[in-house]
């Protein structure tokens, strides 16, 4: 009788653990504390990103590491493209991205960083949807 009671709980617990592992492996769930991506992503929104995202393109919104922080920005230029900023022209290295916040007046992004490029290795996901505001 005890064996039967244990097996009743074993399957749901195992399925829950497998489901949580798969969700954690595929999806990123995050919180956006700043207004740097407004109006696209409101300050205080929860977002869902995909860890496996395929080829990234100009216009994609990505989650990446920069100076020890996870940030969310839009790709403005990909490797091989040039970016004009003021009187300067920057060539984005292959395998890197130039990123901007949608709220240009309230975004610390590639325009202000010492190294303005985000290497592909620092990207952890691509935004698939905004969950809640």
Language-model-derived ranges and their functions:
Residues 1-133:
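Extended hydrophobic leader/signal-anchor segments used for secretion and membrane insertion
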